[in-house]
Amino acid sequence: MFVDKARIFVKSGDGGDGAVSFRREKYIPLGGPDGGDGGEGGDVILVVDPNMTTLLDFKYKRKYVSERGQNGQGAKCYGRDGKDLYIKVPMGTIIRDVETDKIMADLAHKDDKFVIVKGGRGGKGNVKFCTPTRQAPNFAQPGMPGEERWISLELKLLADVGLIGFPNVGKSTLLSVASKARPKIANYHFTTITPNLGVVDVSGISSFVMADIPGIIEGASEGVGLGFEFLRHIERTRLLVHVVDISGSEGRDPLEDFLKINEELKKYNIKLWDRPQIVAANKADMVYDDDQFNKFREELNKLGYKNVFKISAATRMGVEDLLKECARVLSTIPVTDMEIPEEERFVPEDKHFTYTIRKEGDTYIVEGTFVDRLLASVNVNEPDSFRYFHKVLRNKGVMAELEEMGIKDGDMVRLNDFEFEFLK
């Protein structure tokens, strides 16, 4: 089964908690604190597997969580870091953040990998909180929670050449004779309902990947037929082979077919319309008058399309010349990565921890990323830890800012769900 879209939940490992521990040994009366730090949480990393061609695996498993960091221990023993979780994806996978619908990464090469969520930082053990005036801290820092998010995976096939054209014009037959691919072939519309890939070996010249793209009909850019479900697979191709039924066996005019398909490409993505095209006038074995082909070629020449081949995929007439021309044209087109527009690019959350203060009645509310991080790293119910919490607020300038705003003794200060009474 070919699956080219998936949505999964990823969560990195939480950091391990720092340890509260004191050295207790015979004949050592002043052992002091010796709590070790917690380990780092494991990352979740997407990595390209060249052997994968579909996102089918994600149809059955949608939740991926990496390992938590181990807690610190006494004797200054650090916790073990959590193991990173590697998720294999096919080459050509685009990763989007579901919440913003922005593109986070485009994994288009064999060795590409991307850290989708980073593990939480391990908490510090109580030995790290020793000062000349606080020689036996009775608190440690909890580990930071790991990141989590829903992401969507979107596969855009990596092919050098894309076969486009109306249904039943012979695209699948052409792919089957040009490569070892074995797509379903029958004499009815939409025989092909998923893209098919084949490696074409042009003897003595080169080899390239060809894709049979189904579902392009009039209105496809607006969702008609199979719609734009498969139009996106053309985006990575460097060259398009536009297959038309020159025999008009279904009562359609080949020139009109050609113009309609190009109009759909233009509506979907203007860059596709500008992509180099070779025209394959297929089913020529059913045409007994060369004037029909010559007239078609003349009209295309007027429109600027010079590469027009008369072929029959069924009898293989003209197919070899067509493939040689594909190889020649490809050699003149550089391989480039897909550009991600600035407005579609995911912007990571600002790692600079900031805060704002506002007043509601007699309560001063402090909020922001600085507050979230601070509360996650202390235990406000433990006296030593609360004093450390108060010191951080003062060193950060929060207390001074509150005083400038006119706070008085007895007023309440709220940080998220935690409140305390202000005293100078």
Swiss-Prot record:
Main location: cytoplasm
CDD domains: Obg
Binding-site residues, GTP: 165-172, 190-194, 212-215, 282-285, 312-314
Pfam families according to UniProt: DUF1967, GTP1_OBG, MMR_HSR1
PROSITE patterns, sorted: G_OBG, GTP1_OBG, OBG, OCT
Cofactor(s) the protein requires to work: Mg(2+)
Family listed: Belongs to the TRAFAC class OBG-HflX-like GTPase superfamily. OBG GTPase family.
Subunit structure: Monomer.
Name of the protein: GTPase Obg
Organism field: Clostridium acetobutylicum (strain ATCC 824 / DSM 792 / JCM 1419 / IAM 19013 / LMG 5710 / NBRC 13948 / NRRL B-527 / VKM B-1787 / 2291 / W)
